A protein has these predicted regions:
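Basic/aromatic recognition patch in beta-strand/loop cores that engages polyanionic ligands
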Residues: 50-82
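Basic, Lys/Arg-enriched alpha-helical interface segments
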Residues: 2-60, 96-98, 104-105
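Enriched for short, Lys/Arg-rich terminal
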Residues: 69-73, 77-105
């Protein structure tokens, strides 16, 4: 299995998602379920990274892949040794509005 590297922005995304679930729905159990689903999805793509859907954007220099975990898209790239998780978005979010074009930073 490849090493999993979480970019700071992806960590902040997940922290925000889990905080929102706890505060909005008052459900730590639902937040834990979401965290588990995201973690399991990342572990699966670390084993088989080609399973994620290709995602290319004209504004981005590299091609990314994405995988769905519950209602969240996880955007990642990979090489022979590493999976890099770049962002995690709710499916209803406008990715351009939320800085997807700034992944390279």
């Amino acid at each position: 299995m490849r090493e999993i590297v979480w970019r700071p922005r992806a960590v902040a995304d997940v922290d925000g998602i889990l905080s929102y679930i706890v505060l909005e729905y008052r459900s730590p159990k639902a937040a834990q379920s979401c965290a588990d689903a995201i973690s399991q999805a990342v572990e699966r793509v670390a084993e088989l990274p080609e399973t994620g859907r290709l995602f290319a954007d004209d504004d981005l220099e590299r091609t990314y892949r994405r995988v769905l975990a519950k209602n969240y898209w996880i955007y990642y790239s990979y090489d022979a040794d590493t999976i890099t998780v770049w962002r995690v978005f709710h499916t209803s979010q406008d990715h351009d509005t939320y800085g997807f074009a700034l992944l390279e930073e």
